[in-house]
């Protein structure tokens, strides 16, 4: 069996824990990715799509009224301004181009909040690929605008009713489909998790977030920020922000997991800090598990963070102490969501509001001149009905 070209592990995390039938597909994908990364024409086409279709580079906005502390500047990396409404579009364009390069005709994807599904649908429409999106039935119900968008762009949306009918079940169904169709289909995984080479591919196709941020900060402030802060579900927006700063040891990397109703309630999605290592979704990673080792249901107000595991590179960055991982509750995220809307006229995704909530908490504690950058990973249009129901007392 031919050897892998890239290291499938990040410390002890990662790997390729899949049925034997999928190993050739993953190796083929790794080969194609390595070749594409070295191919100037592929890179030129990807860069052109990011610039002229998706709208990169995205703005770095200094908030005027948000910071609770006059010594703290809070910048927002505006992935919410990207075509499609979230950071998801970046790596989806990269993977869809890669699929075309490999001669695949079909794309299979999973989605939670629907943002990855929308990004996949728009990339498939643009590049002439057939698109199937698996989505937990619960998420189909709570994200109807995104379901309509996907269907409008020609995607087939398949509700998944098994298990908890959320993202992890959609992941399982998508992987199952791919097992039988990989010769003609590419599985376009939506986060920096899953079996090798996906965590590496997704990081590389998201790393422009941090690269642009670094360049923009040096232009604006003449120095790097003290910390970059991003929400963590599977972890793609965060690893995209962190990747270019990992070697910049003066910059603190802070990931924010969803604490849901509170860590002590078990109604949360914070496996990095409160899970145990296990095998899930083709990788070795921290997992929410019960006392018998069964996967526990994760919970978050934001569908995109409602995931019982996390990408292996985040697990490694946590283990070696290079990044730290905090959490924010539903209530804190809701408060930050409203505060940003009222103070800056920007409505963030509920996912991004978790990162914002922690940034506000951190800003209050700072005792010297500090610059924080929050990755505003997506816009909040998709969440306005959820939030209005909660604020009007229609949900617990």
Swiss-Prot record:
The keyword Coiled coil does not apply. PROSITE patterns: TRP_SYNTHASE_BETA. The keyword Transferase does not apply. One of its GO terms (molecular function) is tryptophan synthase activity. InterPro entries: Trp_synth_b_CS, Trp_synth_beta, Trp_synth_beta/beta-like, TrpB-like_PALP, TrpB-like_PALP_sf. GO terms for cellular component: cytoplasm. The beta subunit is responsible for the synthesis of L-tryptophan from indole and L-serine. HAMAP family: Trp_synth_beta. Tetramer of two alpha and two beta chains. This is Tryptophan synthase beta chain. The lineage of its organism: Bacteria, Pseudomonadati, Pseudomonadota, Gammaproteobacteria, Alteromonadales.
